[in-house]
From Swiss-Prot:
One annotated GO molecular function: butyrate kinase activity
Cystine residue pairs: none
Pfam families linked: Acetate_kinase
EC numbers: 2.7.2.7
Protein's cellular compartments: Cytoplasm
Residue stretches in coiled coil: none
Domain of life: Bacteria
Protein name as annotated: Probable butyrate kinase
Keywords in alphabetical order: ATP-binding, Cytoplasm, Kinase, Nucleotide-binding, Transferase
Annotated gene: buk
Amino acid sequence: MSVNRILVINPGSTSTKIGVFDNERPVLEETIRHDVEQIGKYKRIIDQYEFRKETILEVLHSHGINISKLNAVCGRGGLLRPIEGGTYTVNDAMLEDLKNGFSGHHASNLGGILAYEIASGLNIPAFIVDPVVVDEMEPVARISGIAGMERKSIFHALNQKAVARKVAEQLNHKYEDLNLLVTHMGGGITVGAHKKGRVIDVNNGLNGEGPFSPERAGTVPVGQLVEMCFSGEYYRDEMIKKLVGQGGLVSLIGTNDAIKVEQMVEKGDPEATLIYKAMAYQVAKEIGGASAVLHGKIDAIVLTGGLAYSKILVDEIKERVDWIADVIVHPGEDELEALAEGALRVLREEEAPKEYVVREKETVARG
């Protein structure tokens, strides 16, 4: 089998994770931590790309990686327009939306830009894979009870789809042939209904839908939320922080560290026990609702993400949902590996690269 060497880039706010893979085998994985003062000199996140590019190249050189031997570069997908899942070639339309922050400004926007900047000098392809804006929701799933307020698909697409593919392989099937309920449990929690390779419904784990999580409030009583917003006690930014960052376990028990909460549960703390059970309860309830989306025809329920290492949480969830389908636990996440696998599928011609196309304010994915 021929060897494809892939450079993978996953930019964070103050770090850049990089990996070099020979097919599925990691040759190098490193987290480059950037000096906060250095990156603080740039007015916009997007202006950091040249600095980060040079840093990446220096690190590769220091490890003896010859970039001329690369077959492709793959970056983490950023805040683009809604697109279907898959591996996309980085093109001019995508670069423009990433640089302009079409759907927001985030360090992940640098992923496609860095991949393109390095790949173009080597005359090799640059890709992104399954960004958070993946949107495969069916029309019926988009409707909310308020006109003009449509439900949005924002979730852990990269890890959900990567783990779904692993589970399909484990079950000796193709991802595109199965119905799966995949739950990513990390700082945010998302439950996706995967129907034959498409996530036809999923809770918006970013800003207020679904189970509460270590840092996010999830679905809350809307009437009380409105009253709080107009109480005169809070600014807009404070309310947003209550939903994202200071919600969930942070609000209820004062920490986003699930390990600490587990230790409290093991010591018999009644408040911690109730709150941890409530989080598991809400996850199970979301899984139950998602099972109806797939008409109860479920091949497996999958639990993944950092919280899937928690036996207490996993057992609580299993107890409530294992009557629906077998529960398969794939703890943790490996974004570098998932990105490399997405690029590899294209290089091996197992799937065609998709093209990011903007037409009349709409994005169309072409395979």
